[in-house]
Structures are given as C-alpha cells and as structure tokens.
Amino acid sequence: MNKISGLSNYRADNDKAMRDAYSETMLKLGAENDNIMVLDVDCSRSMASGDFKKAYPAQYINLGIQEANAVGVAAGLSAEGQIPFLNAFGVFATRRVFDQAFLSCGYAHLNAKIIGWDAGVGAETNGGTHMPFEDAGIMRSIPEMTVVEPADPVALAAVLKE
C-alpha cells in the first residue's frame, strides 16, 4: 500500500471512538459489496461489529474464541472470492495466529484482513496477557502482509476502504 486514499483533506475526528469508525465504515462497505464478510471471535460488543451483524447477517460469522481457526476460515472465504475482515484482540490476531496467517494468507497470496484491536501496550485494562510488544513486528515478517496501525478514526476508515 503506497498511499492511503481519502486522506488528502484530512481532518481529525476527535469525538469518535475507533470502534465506532470501524462499525460505520464496515456498514458502508457491506452495503456497497456483498462479498464483504465480518468474522468475529466472540468480541462483537468490544469490536462494535454487532450493527454489521444485524444489518448483514449473511455476511457475518461469529467463530467463537478460536482465532487461529478464524484465520483459516478467512483464508477459505478469500479463496472463494469473499473479502473477509477478521476482528480480534491484537495479541490474539498476531501471536496466536501467526502460522495460519503466514501459510494460509501470506504464502497463499490471499486477501484476508486481520484486524487486531488494542495492539501493543494499549490494552492495559485487560492485563499483561493482552499487551504484546511484538505484534506488528511479527506480522511484518509475513510475505505479502501489509501492516497498518491507524492513529485515529479518520485513518482507520481510510485503511478499511483500501
């Protein structure tokens, strides 16, 4: 990704939470494209994907707390022409799924979006098990993987549309 489109007239939206920007953007993308899929791992409330589930139930799958399997499902959906967006806490969307992301997504050149919420040390309220230091670094080592860490809701919305 050489350029994130839509940021030429950048204005910060300081009143919007990242999860709300995610929810609004995914609702728009779901309306525009039936191939958009949202995959959750029992975190629809914390990731604000419940509205997408209500609006597009056929485009939503809750796989339960099994992040590694969810990456395999995302890869399979991508191989069949869908565009999956997988939501998980950052530590579980990176360290826990590394092998599946490497082989099933990167090595296979598939278009699966893995969204890790509360990346890095940003999830202090959830304790040390949710605070990886290496999350972005290990994902950057995967061939064909693009790692983006949007700083605010405007950047997040732009990245999701790419």
Positions of PLM-derived features:
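Thiamine diphosphate
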Residues: 1-162
